[in-house]
Amino acid sequence: MDCCASRSCSVPTGPATTICSSDKSCRCGVCLPSTCPHTVWLLEPICCDNCPPPCHIPQPCVPTCFLLNSCQPTPGLETLNLTTFTQPCCEPCLPRGC
């Protein structure tokens, strides 16, 4: 059960900004790309040992997609680069009920 001690979570490569946080059922990280073109099933954690299935991360939990789909006013949204959809996020959005 100590396989994660010397290994790291697989992180998607590319220009997309990732938000990594630990998952409750796995010791590896959950990597959440903050760009909308990524599909939901690519946002599930990758574990290096036998662990329970991770929670499903709903689409609104992607930070930039949540901002673009939110009906609440978002100050500074007009300054986003709509070509890259990259924007830092202070608090990672995690699904409830894990």
From Swiss-Prot:
Sequence repeat boundaries on the chain: 3-7, 47-51, 89-93
Source domain of life: Eukaryota
Pfam family, one: Keratin_matx
Keyword Repeat recorded: yes
A GO molecular function held by the record: structural molecule activity
Annotated region (3 X 5 AA repeats of C-C-X(3)), positions in chain: 3-59
Keyword tags: Keratin, Repeat
GO cellular component, one term: cytosol
Family: Belongs to the KRTAP type 3 family.
Its biological purpose: In the hair cortex, hair keratin intermediate filaments are embedded in an interfilamentous matrix, consisting of hair keratin-associated proteins (KRTAP), which are essential for the formation of a rigid and resistant hair shaft through their extensive disulfide bond cross-linking with abundant cysteine residues of hair keratins. The matrix proteins include the high-sulfur and high-glycine-tyrosine keratins.
PANTHER family found in the cross-reference section: KERATIN ASSOCIATED PROTEIN 3-3-RELATED, KERATIN-ASSOCIATED PROTEIN 3-2
Record note on quaternary structure: Interacts with hair keratins.
Name of the protein described by the UniProt record: Keratin-associated protein 3-2
Organism expressing this protein natively: Homo sapiens
